[in-house]
Amino acid sequence: MLPCRRLVLSCKNQAASFLRRCGPSKRIQSVNYCKSTRQGHEIPDVKPLFPTGGGTQAPSRSRARYAVPAILLGFAGFVGFLHYNDERRAVPRGQASSNSGCGCGSNTTVKGPIIGGPFTLVSTENKIVTENDFCGKWVLLYFGYSFSPDVGPEQLKMMSKAVDKLESKHNEKILPVFVTLDPQRDTPSHLHAYLKEFDSRILGLTGTASAMRQMAQEYRVYFKKVQEDGEDYLVDTSHNMYLINPKMEIVRCFGVEYNPDELSQELLKEVASVSQ
């Protein structure tokens, strides 16, 4: 009988040892106690100490909730800055430029596009020229460069013929002005020799790279160097002409689609409308 009792105790000890080795769940838990209204004794309320996988979704959703409005707000601020910068550089519609110095009132009507602004450049005679030097004159302003292989020379010829026709047949004087977009090669002496081949009345203007870039921005002129190979390169530009009235207001913009006769007729219309 004694050996049987020892065998039973041995089995119990082995079972207890096995249970101790297995132990409880390894998940760390915190135990809170609450009183049960039914049992009248404390019941442990077991909750994980650290959140499991399902609890990580809330912070992610919270971050996404604030990220989208922040991105939209930043984009709106960037667009607003660009608009403010553009308005700051432009001549307001319906008003003359406050920097023109031509005595224009604030109620002066501007028919042309919202472009233009102050500038300081150098003429082919190495003299400083600003927008104030054009006050009281009709000006036909052309942006180009002397190394243009085709469009540039054609535009200068058209400018010369149109201005000459207005002066000889209608006694209307318009000052033709050539503004280079390639100051690196178009020095005052080079421009003087180049423009002399077309018309000695054309005033050539050049300057530093930053000054030319600023004026191009003020007058909304696109230009970009292409096919660069050392000193041999072309400049891609829109080849626009601007008619400026004696108050330094942009009246019209002319593209390459005009011929000399059409250009002179359009110029005469604008000059005559102001003279009436």
Curated annotation (Swiss-Prot):
BP GO terms, sorted: copper ion homeostasis
UniProt note on tissues of expression: Expressed in the whole plant with highest expression in imbibed seeds and embryos, and the root hair zone.
Protein location: Mitochondrion inner membrane
Effect of deleting the gene: No visible phenotype.
Main localisation: mitochondrion
Residue intervals of the Thioredoxin domain: 110-273
Transit peptide region: 1-14
Keyword terms, alphabetized: Chaperone, Membrane, Mitochondrion, Mitochondrion inner membrane, Transit peptide, Transmembrane, Transmembrane helix
Gene3D superfamilies: Glutaredoxin
Family statement: Belongs to the SCO1/2 family.
Name of the protein in question: Protein SCO1 homolog 2, mitochondrial
